[in-house]
Structures are given as C-alpha cells and as structure tokens.
C-alpha cells in the first residue's frame, strides 16, 4: 500500500516508524484472517480510517490530556484495536488486551510475536467480569477502553472498577443521543463515576460519525461491581 493511500488526517498523526508498524500489523491481521475471522475492516480505508484513525484520533487530538507512560487495558480487544494502535503510538505504556474468545487471544499473541512492539503487552483470555473482581487488576489502570462492545451503560460497569482514582475510561460509540446520555449518567451515579467529556468527529472519506465518551471515577467504585457474568448486559444499572 502506498503512503498516498493513507489519509492526510492520519499521516499528520504518525511518524515514519509508526506507519511501517501499522503496515506490518495490517499484513499480519490479513494473514490471520484466513484462519480466524478477526475483522472485515482490513483493506484500504476500512483499515486506515475505520481501524487506525478511529482508534487514534481521541489520543492524538486531545493535547490537554497526558496519555504517555500509562497502564492501559482494552476490553473486548477483538483484532487488537484500539489496543495495538495505542501501543504503537505510546511505546512507554504497559498494555493489557482482554477478550473472552480464545481464538482471538491466540491471534493477538501471534501478532505480538510478529510485530516489534516496544511495550510490554499482555493478552488475557477471560471475561472482564472475572478480571474486574481480581485484586491484581481492580483499580489498577490509568486508561481503560472499550470499542464496539455492548452498550455504554453496560460497558461502564466493566470499565469503572478497573480504573485508578485518577484513571480515565474511554468508550467508543457511533451515534449518541440524549437518551444514551441520561442512561449513562444514571449508571455512572451507581458506580460512583461521572462523564468527563464527550467528543465527536466525522471520520475522513465519509466513514461516518464517531463519538467518544470519557468517563472517570468520582469516588471508589463499590466492590460488588462488576457483577457476575452476563448481568451487566442483561440488567443494565439504571440508578
């Protein structure tokens, strides 16, 4: 793929070494896709915009926040976005990628072996409800992300218990309505969290609208969260 095929909006966010790593990552995911259906967003703009740019703009364009040298967890990593994108552009951070599908976590491990990441990257094959109740992980992260995983109210129950007192949760969403906002606020109130900021962006080349919701703890999240497997999705907290 030629550099010219990468949108300028993305070229402006990356250096040459990072572009090379993202190309290598694309090739490896393409290879693994023959064995495991990781993603359909792997060619052309689907990869460079819907995967790479969509993962990165929230980190690169929020210059008022420090995203470097952090302990980072991505919940429901799938093929590795935004986790790998964050790792490539923040090489001093420690990365944890979580997915309940063993096929996907096996593929993530293969990718890590193939790409020369500078980070320490750990892959966990488990449900986040289990991980979030372990003392070695609970309240242990500076940044927790979830992209294309369930609804925001459900995801916030996964994210808040993982965050340190000054941590930041990042929820990637497509559309965002006033009703979504009200529901999330009610859920966060139960979890002792709050919405910090909502940012919107039209992705380049007509790839659609993206909303990113930043959430943070306002006090310690009650120990009973996250609830046991499936409850957050089946019975979202409503305040």
UniProtKB/Swiss-Prot annotation:
Superkingdom field: Bacteria
Molecular-function GO terms, alphabetical: rRNA (guanine-N7-)-methyltransferase activity
Alphabetized Pfam families for the sequence: GidB
The keyword Cytoplasm belongs to this UniProt entry's keyword annotation: yes
Subcellular location: Cytoplasm
SUPFAM superfamilies to which the protein is assigned, alphabetical: S-adenosyl-L-methionine-dependent methyltransferases
Cellular compartments per GO CC: cytosol
Keyword tags: Cytoplasm, Methyltransferase, rRNA processing, S-adenosyl-L-methionine, Transferase
EC number(s) stated in the UniProt entry for this protein: 2.1.1.-
InterPro entries, A to Z: rRNA_ssu_MeTfrase_G, SAM-dependent_MTases_sf
Function field: Specifically methylates the N7 position of a guanine in 16S rRNA.
Record protein name field: Ribosomal RNA small subunit methyltransferase G
Organism: Prochlorococcus marinus subsp. pastoris (strain CCMP1986 / NIES-2087 / MED4)
